[in-house]
Amino acid sequence: NSTMRRKVEQEGYLQESSKAGLPSATTGFQKSSHLMAFAHNPPAGPLPGAGQAPLGSDYPYYHIAEPQNVPGQIPYPVALHVNIVNVPQPAAAAIQRHYNDEDPEKEKRIKELELLLMSTENELKGQQALPTQNHTANYPGWHSTTVADNTMTSGDNAPVSCLGEHHHCTPSPPVDHGTSEMMSYYMDTTIGSTGPYPLARPGVMQGASSCCEDPWMPCRLQSACCPPRSCCPPWDEAAIQEVPTGLEHYSTDMECADVPLLTPSSKEMMSQALKATFSGFAKEQQRLGIPKDPQQWTETHVRDWVMWAVNEFSLKGVDFQKFCMNGAALCALGKECFLELAPDFVGDILWEHLEILQKEEAKPYPANGVNAAYPESRYTSDYFISYGIEHAQCVPPSEFSEPSFITESYQTLHPISSEELLSLKYENDYPSVILRDPVQTDSLQTDYFTIKQEVVTPDNMCMGRVSRGKLGGQDSFESIESYDSCDRLTQSWSSQSSFQSLQRVPSYDSFDSEDYPAALPNHKPKGTFKDYVRDRADMNKDKPVIPAAALAGYTGSGPIQLWQFLLELLTDKSCQSFISWTGDGWEFKLSDPDEVARRWGKRKNKPKMDYEKLSRGLRYYYDKNVIHKTAGKRYVYRFVCDLQSLLGYTPEEHSSASGLTSSMACSSF
């Protein structure tokens, strides 16, 4: 604006209206006068002078008449009146000129100035007009419109302009869209101000032509009709500063993102991908000098390992303070305790890597001076207590870490094949521990620890014995008993089994190979389960026909699994009120699924177990072809595996046994 004003002054066309002190010269012209190439009728009164404030307003007022290309012959100007009173924003100069046929040179120069004005407004086109709320009762301002041909609506009855914003914005002044329609704006001096701000109440004429014919028109109208910045309420001005980017629709909390549930197939794929990724830890071990055996890790090594995993997999929410322990203590935690150190799924990744490292280190290898027939084995988190399997194993005393208690049952540590389990004798007078001939140790050092062998009987299935001493004699035994006694195992095969606190819940947050086998046992045990339970004299006759713990021992699956637990309930007469056979093969129905879930949670020591989590465990068996859901029936499932070959009796025999006492059922089989 300053540049244009100087240009106008240099050309001699800038004249202050206050110097004349007289009404505008426009009163002498009627049909031949033009306002910046707009045909118009003259205003009824003079424009406000530069030294006087506009009537009815507390703010200085400025008037703008915009240029418009109008086809046809235009008379030459005779005078140019410019009225500028305070310029609070761009393009706020009021230029009024009148034409006659005397000075064509001035007309040419004025057109050049118009082009300069248009180019300046083009640069300011990107600036948005300040939006204001349409409070017509508080803003005096543009009031009336005079239309020469009297064919258009004017004054207070004029509709709101269609240019600019549609909602809560400053309306734009009317635009002449044809040569036959003439219009001008002027200040209404007959209405006083009742508020502190100018009122924006424009008239609009709607011609037949489009309102977008002149590409410069929206920009000029916004520049001309926007009130000063000080007129805008503070909340509108704050809203102008906010530019929508679209990012506000996206959540920035990545930790709250839903994580898809793991399925058997997805877990297998994830395990394969993790194994390939874990291979990169070997370079980190060489760089930091971390031993390959996790048992030998120090606290620093454990911290470096966790740090590597966090960076490698972009893990979040890991509390490094919980991992302030050495490798031996870390490996001795067991999976359940280990998973409590890290958030969901994060602990699974760390545990998977730790297990891989332990399995790689636990691979047998020939020792110097030792016959390859007697491989040496390192101690790991399960201490590899061996029961009646192959030869005795030797470990150096420096690597021996004697546990204070055994936290897992015998079968959890070492799943034994059914051939070996069924080949054992169960006479009560059979010795619980059989020491084999000591290994010839001519070339071995004398200070070694040995793990003795024992044949497992029902009376000592939960008991492990570690012999400590020197090879070749002078053996001393230190018995380490698990928290469950053998009496409890033999006395209760139902829901109060000794395996109670050792099982894991088949919920969506933990898919464990122990709880969820790939299928039923790959090997076929010698004999059927019917023969297996018949030979067990210690079976409680008042308990279910198929105790889950006995079935787990028969199949060698380790911890009790959900399908085994369901079979136990289905053969227990006291449970027929909430789970029973339907009579159609191996199909069964959960009459009270909540009660089944409660008992499963009690068996697994998971008080928060409900049917939703139980059903997730059942769905796991769908892909394994163990249990399927019966379509169209609620809470009805079917065993699709070959239970008849496994158990030794038909579905009809099984269904009939449900209505008999346990002793009668056992005798009938």
Swiss-Prot record:
Residues 90-142 are annotated as: Transcriptional activation domain. InterPro entries: Ets1_N_flank, Ets_dom, ETS_fam, Pointed_dom, SAM/pointed_sf, SAM_PNT-ETS-1, Tscrpt_reg_Wos2-domain, WH-like_DNA-bd_sf. Residues 556-640 bind DNA. Keywords: DNA-binding, Host nucleus, Oncogene. GO terms for molecular function: DNA-binding transcription factor activity, RNA polymerase II-specific; sequence-specific DNA binding. It is found in: Host nucleus. Its main location: host cell. Residues 1-27, 132-153 are annotated as: Disordered. Residues 1-10 have a biased composition (Basic and acidic residues). Residues 276-361 form the PNT domain. It comes from the Viruses. CDD domains: SAM_PNT-ETS-1. GO terms for cellular component: host cell nucleus. PANTHER family: ETS (PTHR11849), ETS TRANSLOCATION VARIANT 2 (PTHR11849:SF209). DNA-binding protein that specifically recognizes the sequence 5'-YAAC[GT]G-3'. The Myb-Ets protein induces predominantly erythroblastosis in chicken and transforms avian erythroblasts and immature myelomonocytic cells in culture. It appears that the Ets domain is responsible for the effects on erythroid cells and that the Myb domain encodes the myeloid-transforming capacity. This is p135Gag-Myb-Ets-transforming protein.
